[in-house]
């Protein structure tokens, strides 16, 4: 797969590069009052947290689900800030053995927040240990092997677990049921993203004009992390090739350089649609086969590209596989066949290949 000219392409996959993490941290809201968008989630979360604080109780465990880049990690940090607590951060893949989890839990102080990103990827033995920790604030440490093995209970400090997942369907029922509050994060509307871009521009000292903010927000795929990333790339363009002001013309020119089209699709999105249309005549085709065609992992296609393509009405998930809609054919400048669906199937309950 040709990556294109060096420096002329930006990936919109909402995955952070290490060099940009400090900037991302700077742009994160610190309190619920600073968090833009997700109004219903914010209202519900405020009630959960402040209700527990007023009673002097430990808040219920919290689960956030939704596509990457919508603010799940930011909300986890905000929860700790609202509670005046410390936060420990880990991820599901890092918890391979029960001992890994036991060591982390035993180091928690009373009232701490434990944030587990990608919690659906936690190993089953560690997950089973987590059940008891969430309910009774203790874990059982198994000493020895075979018939002579003994279980030693270990008390841990009361804590609040915050889990984040991009695949809520991959969570086991017992784990999901132990969260007292669950919230699904929705894609942002352009007007909300415009507020995100304006706030970030103020923090970064960017000379952002009204039309420039609207254009960046419109092409940000409904995702704040992408909006912030595009703002930084447009800022670079404005400082190097213009007078530093992010106007409409500057934003459009910059986004063209970075290969972000008018619908917010990047190279990978168009590669997925192109393969679906040109190699498989619009589908249906399984996600694994489609991923091979574009040289990516199936999880990347499924978790990064598909949610927005479905929302944009360019891709349909059907029981037989992925299908390009009329909008996808038209976006690629092609005439759609008669069998192409008019809009994406958005059911969350359809069997997927």
Swiss-Prot record:
- GO molecular function per UniProt: ATP binding; ATP hydrolysis activity; four-way junction DNA binding; four-way junction helicase activity
Annotated binding of ATP, by residue: 27-28, 69, 72-74, 135-137, 178, 188, 225
Q: Which GO terms describe its biological process?
A: DNA recombination; DNA repair
Q: What is its main location?
A: cytoplasm
Q: Name one Pfam family in it.
A: RuvB_C
The UniProt catalytic activity note for this protein reads:
ATP + H2O = ADP + phosphate + H(+)
Residue segments, region Disordered: 1-25
Where is DNA bound in this sequence?
317, 322
InterPro entries (UniProt xref):
AAA+_ATPase, AAA_lid_4, DNA_helicase_Holl-junc_RuvB, P-loop_NTPase, RuvB-like_N, RuvB_C, WH-like_DNA-bd_sf, WH_DNA-bd_sf
Residues given in the record as Mg(2+) binding sites: 73
Chain segments carrying region Head domain (RuvB-H)? 262-353
Q: What is its EC number?
A: 3.6.4.-
Region (Large ATPase domain (RuvB-L)), start-end ranges: 1-188
Keywords, in A-Z order: ATP-binding, Cytoplasm, DNA damage, DNA recombination, DNA repair, DNA-binding, Hydrolase, Nucleotide-binding
**Where is this chain's protein located in or outside the cell?**
Cytoplasm
Write down any Gene Ontology CC term.
Answer: cytoplasm
The top EC class is hydrolase
Free-text note regarding domains: Has 3 domains, the large (RuvB-L) and small ATPase (RuvB-S) domains and the C-terminal head (RuvB-H) domain. The head domain binds DNA, while the ATPase domains jointly bind ATP, ADP or are empty depending on the state of the subunit in the translocation cycle. During a single DNA translocation step the structure of each domain remains the same, but their relative positions change.
Please give the NCBIfam families that the UniProt record associates with this protein.
PRK00080.1, ruvB
Reported function? The RuvA-RuvB-RuvC complex processes Holliday junction (HJ) DNA during genetic recombination and DNA repair, while the RuvA-RuvB complex plays an important role in the rescue of blocked DNA replication forks via replication fork reversal (RFR). RuvA specifically binds to HJ cruciform DNA, conferring on it an open structure. The RuvB hexamer acts as an ATP-dependent pump, pulling dsDNA into and through the RuvAB complex. RuvB forms 2 homohexamers on either side of HJ DNA bound by 1 or 2 RuvA tetramers; 4 subunits per hexamer contact DNA at a time.
UniProt record similarity statement: Belongs to the RuvB family.
- Assembly: Homohexamer. Forms an RuvA(8)-RuvB(12)-Holliday junction (HJ) complex. HJ DNA is sandwiched between 2 RuvA tetramers; dsDNA enters through RuvA and exits via RuvB. An RuvB hexamer assembles on each DNA strand where it exits the tetramer. Each RuvB hexamer is contacted by two RuvA subunits (via domain III) on 2 adjacent RuvB subunits; this complex drives branch migration. In the full resolvosome a probable DNA-RuvA(4)-RuvB(12)-RuvC(2) complex forms which resolves the HJ.
* Name of this protein: Holliday junction branch migration complex subunit RuvB
What organism is listed for this UniProt entry? Saccharopolyspora erythraea (strain ATCC 11635 / DSM 40517 / JCM 4748 / NBRC 13426 / NCIMB 8594 / NRRL 2338)
- Please name the gene that encodes this protein: ruvB
């Amino acid at each position: 797969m040709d990556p294109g000219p060096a420096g002329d392409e930006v990936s919109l996959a909402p995955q952070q590069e290490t060099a940009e993490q400090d900037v991302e941290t700077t742009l994160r809201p610190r309190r619920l009052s600073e968090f833009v968008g997700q109004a219903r989630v914010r209202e519900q979360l405020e009630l959960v947290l402040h209700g527990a604080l007023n009673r002097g109780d430990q808040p219920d465990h919290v689960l956030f689900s939704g596509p990457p880049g919508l603010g799940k990690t930011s909300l986890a940090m905000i929860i700790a800030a609202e509670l005046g607590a410390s936060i420990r951060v880990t991820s599901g893949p890092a918890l391979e053995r029960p001992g890994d989890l036991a060591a982390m839990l035993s180091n928690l102080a009373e009232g701490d927040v434990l944030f587990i990103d990608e919690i659906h990827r936690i190993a089953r033995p560690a997950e089973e240990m987590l059940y008891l920790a969430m309910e009774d604030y203790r874990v059982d440490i198994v000493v020895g092997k075979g018939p002579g093995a003994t279980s030693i209970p270990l008390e841990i400090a009361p804590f609040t677990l915050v889990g984040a997942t991009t695949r809520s369907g991959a969570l086991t029922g017992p784990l999901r049921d132990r969260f007292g509050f669950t919230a699904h994060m929705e894609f942002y509307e352009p007007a909300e993203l415009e507020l995100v871009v304006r706030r970030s521009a103020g923090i970064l000292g960017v000379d952002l004009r009204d039309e420039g903010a609207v254009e960046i927000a419109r092409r940000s795929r409904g995702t704040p992390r992408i909006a912030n990333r595009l703002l930084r790339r447009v800022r670079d363009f404005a400082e190097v090739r213009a007078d530093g002001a992010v106007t409409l013309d500057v934003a459009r020119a910059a986004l063209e350089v970075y290969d972000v089209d008018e619908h917010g699709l990047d190279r990978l999105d168009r590669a997925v649609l192109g393969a679906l249309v040109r190699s498989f005549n619009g589908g249906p085709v399984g996600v694994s086969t489609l991923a091979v065609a574009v040289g990516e992992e199936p999880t990347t296609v499924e978790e990064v590209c598909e949610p927005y393509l479905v929302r944009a009405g360019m891709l349909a998930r059907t029981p037989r596989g992925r299908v390009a809609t009329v909008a996808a054919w038209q976006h690629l400048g092609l005439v759609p066949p008669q069998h192409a669906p008019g809009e994406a199937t958005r059911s969350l309950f359809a069997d997927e290949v």
